[in-house]
Amino acid sequence: MLGLQRETSSMYKRTSSRDYSPMIDVEDSSGLLENDVDNEMETTNPSWKCSLPHVLVATISSFLFGYHLGVVNEPLESISSDLGFSGDTLAEGLVVSVCLGGAFLGSLFSGGVADGFGRRRAFQICALPMILGAFVSGVSNSLAVMLLGRFLVGTGMGLGPPVAALYVTEVSPAFVRGTYGSFIQIATCLGLMAALFIGIPVHNITGWWRVCFWLSTIPAALLALGMFLCAESPQWLFKQGKIAEAEAEFERLLGGSHVKTAMAELYKLDLDKTDEPDVVSLSELLYGRHSRVVFIGSTLFALQQLSGINAVFYFSSTVFKSAGVPSDLGNIFVGVSNLLGSVIAMVLMDKVGRKLLLLWSFIGMAAAMALQVGATSSYLPHFSALCLSVGGTLVFVLTFALGAGPVPGLLLPEIFPSRIRAKAMAFCMSVHWVINFFVGLLFLRLLEKLGPRLLYSMFSTFCLMAVMFVKRNVIETKGKTLQEIEISLLAKP
């Protein structure tokens, strides 16, 4: 469990996993794998309780991600007034969006940090700029200092999601990996809602926006400290040649009876990859033997953003205001829809599978965008159009949270081979942030030039394209170990 005393790495000799000679003959590892898998299937799955505390600590990074996405929404007017740029829409936009620049930079380095320092240390490195940036934002007395603080926070936001996806995927037993992966999305929703509720007093208490930033240092510090007690990824330890430590961490996460099977799977994969270099280059990701899965991952993230989710979040306040609903109440409705969809996804992820959730999620989002298109019709009464618009917004957020939101972050670490997993996630997340930036930058301009009907039709078309892409390219990973998924992908021509 979480509180067990960690054995120091100095007790173990650091050797290459390929040179290490275990007690069992490595040449027999393939047969051992098959026998052990059969035996284990005849008994029971590993206990989910062993890995749960480690997953919960890791999802603090996702809570922080959601919190910092929403922390300036309510206080922005007070911030601009206190710092002297009230009415300057460009400056206000920079305060909101400068995080994206930091997040893009952080995502570029996330793979190197996760592979170089390990998953646990990567979380701690992620927490540092979040603590420093939140403190700087809270004490800022000018726009420049505020932007510096927000940029620092953004770098932590860019580091956190890829590392969280990697860690949760690598420490979770196969039969609950989908459920645990959904915790990431739920934590993000809770962070967004926490930022909303904490920001409510900002209109009545002078300088409350500073408290909103400072409060975020508490979960960031808990993340950094909690990781001292958490298990390191056994896959990462194995790659580093720390065989005994990998076995010890498997025992903490799965239980002693499942260690031999898990290690045999790693040895089988290691034998299959003896001709591959240790260093993963960008050219290998784009043109190497695993380029197809990298293409699938980056395209999924691109389609996720091109579906219009951030535009819907951005425009939801206007939609609710036009229907006579206060913006803060409208934000609560959106937050509840997001959380409800995420909870349903958590329940269904390991029952119906990732692919089916993705398909129905994008289908539902396309239908919701069709409702938005219908709401722009001049033939509808005003009240009916408002109902369609509000209903379309809530249905879109709900169906997004069912699959298109949580599944890519879970699915990609599952289908990426262990050797390239961190670097491939970093590449795909950088694609995510670039598309995110341009959608946010161009949405209002396109809305003005094209009108809502054509723009929402484009978003609906992207959702339908995503349905076809998922149906053709995405494999089902439900209930399979990471090693089984990798072996099946390697077996494909």
From Swiss-Prot:
| Compartments reported by the entry | Plastid, Chloroplast membrane
Question: Which domain of life does this protein belong to?
Answer: Eukaryota
Q: Does the keyword Transmembrane apply?
A: yes
* Residue ranges of the TM segments: 52-72, 94-114, 128-148, 151-171, 182-202, 211-231, 293-313, 329-349, 356-376, 392-412, 424-444, 450-470
Keyword Transport in the entry? The reply is yes
* Membrane-related topology note: Multi-pass membrane protein
* Role description: May be involved in the efflux of glucose towards the cytosol.
| Family (UniProt) | Belongs to the major facilitator superfamily. Sugar transporter (TC 2.A.1.1) family.
Listed PANTHER family = FACILITATED GLUCOSE TRANSPORTER PROTEIN 1 (PTHR23503:SF8), SOLUTE CARRIER FAMILY 2 (PTHR23503)
Stated name of the protein:
Probable plastidic glucose transporter 2
